[in-house]
């Protein structure tokens, strides 16, 4: 008896006529976790903005700090600002892997995957501009604090950018390919594997295994090319 050929199915939205390979299935637990991480990220960004406002108030003299101490207070506020922004951005990126945005809405997809960068600019660019325009601080303090603020802006931006954004469509495609099976990945690899005996895993002393959703959460969103060939 001839083996039935597997039919590649395409899903069509009745209301819009748009096609796709089926919607991504995001569990209630993952949605809840993603929402919690996004809320925490926003709270941290608000606190980072408060740190920037504090630095601006010190810079303008509204919040009185002795001149000989002002540089240290300004740098301290910028460091706190940086830490809060980076932690918030990491949480936001983790949330995006648990519950990614769809590419069907290009605006939302862009905003969702660049919120950390936007927060970085908001939390550092104003203070950098004000420092460059300030004429009241002594030259040494102005130079040092401006350099610190500029470096903080660059670091916050680099840590906040998602260089490998995931879409709901990519998650759906991976779910369709893997189903309810187990996938495997390593600590430093960028791919997930369908075969635990894949030769690219043989030199790793520790191999993680889990669902495709857990692999995406770990930022392993690219299927191993060798495993994919073996599955064909």
What is each residue range found by the language model?
Residues 158-232:
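Mature, structured domains enriched in cysteine- and short glycine motifs
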Residues 71-74, 96-117:
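Loop-to-transmembrane helix junctions at the membrane interface
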Residues 1-86:
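Membrane-anchoring hydrophobic segments
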Residues 57-58, 89-93, 160:
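Juxtamembrane cytosolic interface motif at the C-terminal end of transmembrane helices
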Residues 108-109, 113-150:
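Cytosolic-side transmembrane helix boundary signature
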Residues 64-69, 99-106, 135-143:
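Membrane-interface helix-boundary motifs at transmembrane edges
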Residues 146-161:
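Final/C-terminal transmembrane alpha-helix of multipass membrane proteins
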Residues 83-99:
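Membrane-water interface of transmembrane alpha-helices
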